[in-house]
Amino acid sequence: MDSSSSVVYVGSSSKSRNFQSKSKGSITSFSIDSRGTKKSMKTLLIPEPEPTSPEVIESSVSSVSAESETPISIIRKKKQSEPRFYSSPTNTFYTEAKQSFTNTEFSECASISTIGIGGIDLEKNGVMIYRGSIGSDVSDESSSSGLSNAAYKPHRDNNDKRWVAIQEVRSRVGSSLEAKDFKLIKKLGGGDIGNVYLAELIGTGVSFAVKVMEKAAIAARKKLVRAQTEKEILQSLDHPFLPTLYSHFETEMNSCLVMEFCPGGDLHSLRQKQRGKYFPEQAARFYVAEVLLAMEYLHMLGIIYRDLKPENVLVREDGHIMLSDFDLSLRCAVSPTLVRFAAITLESKSSSYCIQPTCVDQSSCIVQPDCIQPVCFTPRFLSKGKHRKKSNDMSRQIRPLPELIAEPTSARSMSFVGTHEYLAPEIIKGEGHGSAVDWWTFGIFLYELLFGITPFRGGDNRATLFNVVGQPLRFPEHPNVSFAARDLIRGLLVKEPQHRLAYRRGATEIKQHPFFQSVNWALIRCTSPPQIPQPVKPMDQAHSVRHGFSQGHGHVGYDKPPTVDVKPSGNYLEIDFF
């Protein structure tokens, strides 16, 4: 055994201990009994590799490093540049955000090239978090990607009766869903680029909402891009308060989107049924909280909604909401950042103060330890501690959790879109607008739910636009609404977008407002809704559609083909400058 060999102990038995001796070109196994006698010598020769020139070695090393660059180095590079995400015990949004980034990262590693999601490219070096399928994995149509749908749709419930019905029909017909598989029952409503019908998937008894867009009409109005944008956005969504695109198909004349049917109608109709035609504050808080989470998710994806109003907030069969109608939405880039806040030292001699500028009522200032950053903080519990032992500095500090901010603040559009009473001042002025318009409309939305009217409505559309730009915000004397609700509305309806609540920090800032103090964000889906809609019997509805999609021409089975109203309604307006 030469000097270059090494001996390794590999185990023992009842009568001996076993060793291996490794040297250049061979491995020798042997054992030593209790008397110290070496025996059972076995030698395994290892063949020498053929000599390789330095040039070949260098070439092969560079080749291997280039190949290994793909999955591992991308992850390492991203981890160096991406913020870390921490979950909050009271907010599942951060866990969902982390899952969103994980899915995006996985999709990048899977194909080693830029992956398009609904026509949007994911940037390798930036942090763009469009989350969704490659192709049409959210519909019933097969995807060309080999990746699992579940990797992109964690909220998809395969036990959902709608998915079960679709799979049942697909297995029976052996193809994707088509127009002939649906029987249209009644018209539910109409939008700017199409009409929505209640439809039954034939042979299953399961109802869907089918949006039918007439190709010729939307092409004549130059709305094809709007229709395509809506479909791509729907394909990318995966959130409890946003719609699922179950299928999409085309006929000769129509383009159709198959979504969930919400039997509770919309919040506008539901508000009209309330006593006084406004919601109690507790009910309004429930609805706007769920809308806020949906908007937060959209902004994380770089989607500015731009059309929030009660008519577009639908009520599901369980009483929770679903945001609908994305044909006016704007897609843009977003760069999420993780902000860490310094620890806040509590001084017993300090007086009450508020961190948020919109909160001016000291009686509403309380400690919110479950928030990421205290909104309004009063160290009143320290004033009772005269007989307490003096604690150290560490115990007298609040250390806020890191805060994820994913607000697309850099987005700019010159489009003049929306409903007159909900238009933000910067849209009317033509100054260009970004994500802050959604928080203006959120303020109008909350105002209407609480008071039954919008704050700037005039005698006609021209007067309404003038009021939005030039008139101050006023509140009616009745009904009686809490200070926190009025304070939140004041913060949202600031005419200068850069001073508007949530302009920088987005929905996180709104969620920390005292108006939402009683909301448990982590368990909001378990909260009992203010009202559960009555079960709907679709076949008993009046004004039903006669048959279904007629074969051949692709018309809806109505007395005449459905047409998209070429003239916008009186409250709706859209002008694209570029």
UniProtKB/Swiss-Prot annotation:
PROSITE patterns: PROTEIN_KINASE_DOM (PS50011), PROTEIN_KINASE_ST (PS00108). It catalyses: L-seryl-[protein] + ATP = O-phospho-L-seryl-[protein] + ADP + H(+); L-threonyl-[protein] + ATP = O-phospho-L-threonyl-[protein] + ADP + H(+). One of its GO terms (biological process) is basipetal auxin transport. A motif (PIF) lies at residues 575-578. Residues 25-34 have a biased composition (Polar residues). This is Serine/threonine-protein kinase D6PKL3. Residues 182-516 form the Protein kinase domain. The activation loop within the kinase domain is the target of phosphorylation. Keywords: ATP-binding, Auxin signaling pathway, Cell membrane, Kinase, Membrane, Nucleotide-binding, Serine/threonine-protein kinase, Transferase. Disruption phenotype: No visible phenotype under normal growth conditions, but the quadruple d6pk, d6pkl1, d6pkl2 and d6pkl3 mutants are deficient in lateral root formation and mildly agravitropic, have fused or single cotyledons and narrow and twisted leaves, form few axillary shoots, are almost infertile and impaired in phototropic hypocotyl bending when exposed to lateral white light. It is a peripheral membrane protein. Protein kinase that regulates the auxin transport activity of PIN auxin efflux facilitators by direct phosphorylation. D6PK-mediated PIN phosphorylation promotes auxin transport in the hypocotyl and this is a prerequisite for PHOT1-dependent hypocotyl bending. Residues 1-64 are annotated as: Disordered. One of its GO terms (molecular function) is protein kinase activity. GO terms for cellular component: plasma membrane. It comes from Arabidopsis thaliana. Residues 1-24, 53-64 have a biased composition (Low complexity).
